[in-house]
C-alpha cells in the first residue's frame, strides 16, 4: 500500500546501470509513491539493461544521456520540455573513475582519470541542475549520491574521494544559487553497497565487513534504505531542507572507532 508522497510529481532518474543500482532502488520506491518517471542510460550496452527495468515499473520515457556531450544533455531536456513541460525532481546518480586506479595509491592517479572522474561525477551535477532549473517551474528537488570517502580517507577509493568531496561542496553552492527559485539541492551519503560501480573498488568486501562491524546498527546499508531517504528528499516532507549531506549509513559516520 502506497502513501503517495510523490503523487502527481514527475522525476528524472539518472545513473541506472542494472537491477542492483542504487538509482534503480530509488526509482522503484518513487514509483510506488506515485511519481511519473523518466529514465536515462549512458550507452547502447546499458540501454539493453535499462529499458526492461523501465517497462517493469511502467516508466514510459527512456532516453540516452552522455553527460560529457553538451548536445546529449540539451536533447534530453528539449524532449522533457516537449513531453512534460515541467518536472519536479532530479536524481543525479552517475559517477566514474578508471577501475584500474581504484586500488593502490591516490598519488599515482593519471591526469586523464582525474579529469574524467571530476567531469562525470561532479561537473555533470552542475550541467543537469542548470538545465533542470528552467523546467522546475514550481520549484523542485535535486538529489545526488555521495559517500563518506569524501570526508575521510577510504583505502582504494582514491580519486573518487576527491570527486565526491567536490560534489558535496557543489551541493551547497547549488543550493544557494537555486534556493531563490524554491529548488532544493541535497546529497545522500550512503554506506557502501554492492553495485556494478562499487565492484571496481579494490578489496570492497573488506570495506563491507568493516562498515557492518563499526556501524551502530551492526549491518550494511541497503538500496532500500537509500530509496526511502530519496523519496523523503523528493517529497514535500523535506520542503525546508536544502544544502544538506544526509547520511544513510547505519550510523557509521558518527563512530570514531570500533567498540573496544
From Swiss-Prot:
Binding annotation for NAD(+): 15, 21-22, 42, 66-67, 94, 164, 193-197
One Pfam family, short name: adh_short_C2
Class in the EC hierarchy, top level: oxidoreductase
Catalytic activity, as annotated: a 2,3-saturated acyl-[ACP] + NAD(+) = a (2E)-enoyl-[ACP] + NADH + H(+)
Binding residue positions for substrate: 97
UniProt keyword terms in alphabetical order: Fatty acid biosynthesis, Fatty acid metabolism, Lipid biosynthesis, Lipid metabolism, NAD, Oxidoreductase
Subunit and interaction comment: Homotetramer.
NCBIfam families named among the record's database cross-references: PRK06603.1
Record's protein name: Enoyl-[acyl-carrier-protein] reductase [NADH] FabI
Organism in which the protein naturally occurs: Rickettsia felis (strain ATCC VR-1525 / URRWXCal2)
Amino acid at each position: 500500500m502506497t502513501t503517495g508522497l510523490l503523487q502527481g510529481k514527475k522525476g528524472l532518474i539518472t545513473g541506472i546501470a542494472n537491477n542492483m543500482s542504487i538509482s534503480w532502488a530509488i526509482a522503484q520506491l518513487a514509483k510506488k509513491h506515485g511519481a511519473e518517471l523518466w529514465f536515462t542510460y549512458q550507452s547502447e550496452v546499458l540501454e539493453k539493461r535499462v529499458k526492461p527495468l523501465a517497462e517493469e515499473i511502467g516508466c514510459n520515457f527512456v532516453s540516452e544521456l552522455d553527460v560529457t556531450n553538451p548536445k546529449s544533455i540539451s536533447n534530453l531536456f528539449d524532449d522533457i520540455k516537449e513531453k512534460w513541460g515541467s518536472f519536479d525532481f532530479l536524481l543525479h546518480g552517475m559517477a566514474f573513475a578508471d577501475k584500474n586506479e581504484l586500488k593502490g595509491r591516490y598519488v599515482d592517479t593519471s591526469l586523464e582519470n582525474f579529469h574524467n572522474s571530476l567531469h562525470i561525477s561532479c561537473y555533470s551535477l552542475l550541467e543537469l541542475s542548470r538545465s533542470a532549473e528552467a523546467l522546475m517551474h514550481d520549484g523542485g528537488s535535486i538529489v545526488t549520491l555521495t559517500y563518506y570517502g569524501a570526508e575521510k580517507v577510504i583505502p582504494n577509493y582514491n580519486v573518487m574521494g576527491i570527486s565526491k568531496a567536490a560534489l558535496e561542496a557543489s551541493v551547497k553552492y547549488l543550493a544557494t544559487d537555486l534556493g531563490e527559485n524554491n529548488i532544493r539541492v541535497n546529497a545522500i551519503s550512503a554506506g557502501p553497497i554492492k553495485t556494478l560501480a562499487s565492484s571496481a573498488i579494490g578489496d570492497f568486501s573488506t570495506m563491507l565487513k568493516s562498515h557492518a562491524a563499526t556501524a551502530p546498527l551492526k549491518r550494511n546499508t541497503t538500496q532500500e534504505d537509500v530509496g526511502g531517504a530519496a523519496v523523503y528528499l523528493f517529497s514535500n516532507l523535506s520542503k525546508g531542507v536544502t544544502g544538506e549531506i544526509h547520511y544513510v549509513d547505519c550510523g557509521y559516520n558518527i563512530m570514531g572507532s570500533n567498540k573496544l
